[in-house]
A protein has these predicted regions:
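Membrane-embedded hydrophobic alpha-helical segments
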Residues: 1-36
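Transmembrane helix-loop junctions and nearby membrane-interface residues
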Residues: 23-30, 62-66, 144-151
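Amphipathic, membrane-active segments
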Residues: 31, 35-75
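Interfacial loop at the N-terminal end of multi-pass membrane proteins
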Residues: 68-80, 90-93
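An amphipathic alpha-helical interaction surface
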Residues: 80-83, 92, 96-207
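Interfacial juxtamembrane loops and adjacent helix segments
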Residues: 87
Length: 207
């Protein structure tokens, strides 16, 4: 009887220990799985944001390219062109070309928007803050292009053109990229802003 009771107790202890061990293993496994899942989510989000960032950089570079190719410059519809002077036809083509270049910038910003919202939910505000420098440079370039097109518009009256030129002359001229390897001030500021974002995101790409 003694040995039977002892054996039952031992068996109970063994079963309990096995259950506890199994629970510990399960909890550790769940913890590892959660870490792996979060790591994968961080990796994918960081990868998407970096790719979109590089595409945005290239789109902004394209806006500033000093050459405007013939295929970029459309003619107005024939019924409109027939009643337009050449300087207005030229301005129409330039405006459409810059609009097409800027549409590409807007497309990449739109692609970034949802991912930046997700990053804010997962990582906080730091990345959004880092993108503030990119947004400021983008807005500065937009104003520069907008003023250039207004000044060159044949329909802009002389007084408005003078006022716009005064504003333009008080600001730095960033319309054209100088295409040097070292880069101009605008490009170097953009590079520095991108490097700060890369430094934040690249640790999240380590798996």
């Amino acid at each position: 009887m003694f040995w039977s009771e002892t054996l039952s107790i031992v068996q109970g202890i063994v079963v309990s220990c096995a259950a506890i061990t199994g629970s510990i293993v399960a909890v550790r496994g769940l913890s590892t799985w959660k870490k792996q899942t979060k790591g994968h989510a961080d990796y994918e989000l960081a990868r998407r944001i970096l790719i979109s960032l590089f595409r945005l950089r290239d789109a902004i570079d394209a806006v500033r390219h000093p050459m405007m190719w013939a295929h970029e410059i459309p003619l107005p519809p024939e019924d409109q062109a027939a009643n337009m002077e050449q300087n207005k036809i030229d301005h129409y083509g330039r405006t459409q070309a810059y609009q097409a270049r800027w549409d590409r910038v807007q497309k990449e910003r739109t692609n970034l928007y949802a991912d930046l919202l997700e990053s804010e939910a997962l990582w906080g505000l730091e990345l959004k803050t880092l993108f503030g420098d990119i947004s400021s440079l983008q807005h500065e370039l937009w104003l520069c292009v907008h003023r250039y097109l207004e000044i060159s518009d044949p329909d802009t009256d002389a007084e408005t053109r003078k006022a716009l030129r005064d504003i333009k002359n008080s600001e730095r001229n960033i319309l054209y990229d100088n295409l040097s390897e070292s880069g101009d001030d605008f490009k170097n500021e953009m590079r520095a802003a991108i490097e700060r974002i890369e430094a934040y995101l690249k640790p999240k790409l380590i798996r």
